Amino acid sequence: MNFETIIGLEVHVELNTNSKIFSPSSAHFGEDPNANTNVIDWSFPGVLPVMNKGVIDAGIKAALALNMDIHKEMHFDRKNYFYPDNPKAYQISQFDEPIGYNGWIDIKLEDGSTKKIRIERAHLEEDAGKNTHGTDGYSYVDLNRQGVPLIEIVSEADMRSPEEAYAYLTALKEIIQYTGISDVKMEEGSMRVDANISLRPYGQEQFGTKTELKNLNSFSNVRKGLEFEVERQAKLLRSGGAIRQETRRYDEANKGTILMRVKEGAADYRYFPEPDLPLYEIDDAWIDEMRAQLPQFPAQRRAKYEEELGLSAYDASQLTATKALSDFFETAVSLGGDAKQVSNWLQGEVAQFLNAEGKTIEEIALTPENLVEMIAIIADGTISSKMAKKVFVHLAKNGGSARAYVEKAGLVQISDPAVLVPIIHQVFADNEAAVADFKSGKRNADKAFTGFLMKATKGQANPQVAQQLLAQELQKLRD
C-alpha cells in the first residue's frame, strides 16, 4: 500500500526587540547565564507583566508579511505546565485569538512551479529558559531566554513531502528576515522548527495519526528527520501496526528519530485568559503604520530584477538571499552601476570574500559607491580586471575611493604607447634568446613576450593595448 505524506510545521521566531516581552530585561543573545534577568523573569510573588509595545508592532508586521488577517481585539492566555526552566509554572501565550490568522505564502517547487501553503495562525508568546545538565550531577537553569519574545507561526498541513517542507522554511525565513523583526539565526536559537507528520492511504480524506518532531536544528535536519519518519511510519503501517500520537526527536548521530514522550493535547495545558494583562485593541491606523514600514519582499524584487534589469532567475534568486544584499545591489544600480556587472561582482569576488571572512555584507567596509566606482575604472581602462581583485580586497577591508587608492598605490594601468613601446624594446634587448627563437619561426615563441612585458611593468600594462603593440613591434622584428 502506498501512502500520502501530510506535513505541517510550527516555527518559533525570536523577535529582535531590545527588551523582553513582559519585563525590562535585555533580550540580547550571548550574555553570561542569568545576566539578563530581573524579578519578573524570576517570577517573584506579586510582580506583574508589562507589555512591550514593540512586540505587538513586530507581530503586526509578521502577520501582514504572511498575508494574514489580524485580530483587532487581542488578548493573552496562560498555558500551564511545570518545568524547571519555567519558574511561573505557566507560559503567557495566545490560544483562541492569536494576533494573526488565515494567511499564506507561495513556495517554489523543484519543477519550477509555485504552490500556496496556508498558515493557520501566528501568535505571540514568551520563550522559556534553558536547562543545562552538568557532568557534576547537577542541572543548571539559565533564565536569560525566559521572557524573550517569540512569534509562533503554525502552517496548515499543506505540505506533501520533506522537499516541500524545506522550500516552505526557506521562503518563510526569507520573508521574516526581510521584515527586520528577527535575524532568524537557527544557530543562535532565534528560529526553531517543530514538524508534524502523518501518513494516509492515497484517496483517504481523514488525516492519519501525527507524530511531532523536535531537535531539528537546521533545515537540512528537518528534511532528514521527515524523510526518516516517512519510512518509519510506512513500514509500521504496512506491517499492520498503528501510529501513536507522540513526540520524537531527531538524532543527528544516528540519522533517525527517538521517542521523547507521548504527545499532550491542548486540554493538558489548561489554557485560560491571562488575568494580569488587558485586552489590546489594534486599530487600522496602527496596522497602516506598520504596513508602511515593510519593504518590498523577495518575490517582487526577483520579478523586478528579471523583467526590468534583464537578470536570470538564478541571479535574481542569489541577489535576494538577504535584504542587506538586495539593498546593496539596488543602491549600486541606482548609482549607475551596470546590473549584470554588479551582480557578477556580488556573486563572485564579494561572496568569496564574505565566506572566507565569515561575515555579512553589512560587516565589511565595501559600499555600493565603492563598487560602482571600481567597475567604472575597470571599464575606462584605469585598472585591469585582474588588478581589480586586489583593489576590491582593499576596499572590502578599508573602504574609501577606488580611484584614489589605485592612484596612491601606483596600480593605474599603462595604456600610453609612448610609454609601452620603449619598454617593449627593452624587453627585446633583455631577452635575446627569445628574440632569436621568434625570428627562426619557433612555434609560440611570440607568447613569451607577453609575460616578459607584464613582468617588466609589474602587471600594470593594459593587456589589450600591450597585445596590439607587441604584435606591431614583433612584426617589425620579422620584417
Curated annotation (Swiss-Prot):
Molecular functions per Gene Ontology: asparaginyl-tRNA synthase (glutamine-hydrolyzing) activity; ATP binding; glutaminyl-tRNA synthase (glutamine-hydrolyzing) activity
Gene3D superfamilies (alphabetical): 1.10.10.410, GatB domain, N-terminal subdomain
The reaction(s) this protein catalyses: L-glutamyl-tRNA(Gln) + L-glutamine + ATP + H2O = L-glutaminyl-tRNA(Gln) + L-glutamate + ADP + phosphate + H(+); L-aspartyl-tRNA(Asn) + L-glutamine + ATP + H2O = L-asparaginyl-tRNA(Asn) + L-glutamate + ADP + phosphate + 2 H(+)
Keywords annotated in UniProt: ATP-binding, Ligase, Nucleotide-binding, Protein biosynthesis
Keyword Metal-binding applies: no
SUPFAM superfamilies named among the record's database cross-references: GatB/YqeY motif (SSF89095), Glutamine synthetase/guanido kinase (SSF55931)
InterPro entries: Asn/Gln-tRNA_amidoTrfase_suB/E (IPR017959), Asn/Gln-tRNA_Trfase_suB/E_cat (IPR006075), Asn/Gln_amidotransferase (IPR018027), Asn/Gln_tRNA_amidoTrase-B-like (IPR003789), GatB (IPR004413), GatB_C_1 (IPR042114), GatB_Yqey_C_2 (IPR023168), Gln-tRNA_amidoTrfase_suB_CS (IPR017958)
Pfam families: GatB_N, GatB_Yqey
Annotated EC: 6.3.5.-
Any one Gene Ontology BP term: translation
Protein family (similarity comment): Belongs to the GatB/GatE family. GatB subfamily.
Family matches, as HAMAP family: GatB
Function field: Allows the formation of correctly charged Asn-tRNA(Asn) or Gln-tRNA(Gln) through the transamidation of misacylated Asp-tRNA(Asn) or Glu-tRNA(Gln) in organisms which lack either or both of asparaginyl-tRNA or glutaminyl-tRNA synthetases. The reaction takes place in the presence of glutamine and ATP through an activated phospho-Asp-tRNA(Asn) or phospho-Glu-tRNA(Gln).
NCBIfam families: gatB, PRK05477.1-1, PRK05477.1-2, PRK05477.1-4
Subunit structure: Heterotrimer of A, B and C subunits.
Protein name as catalogued: Aspartyl/glutamyl-tRNA(Asn/Gln) amidotransferase subunit B
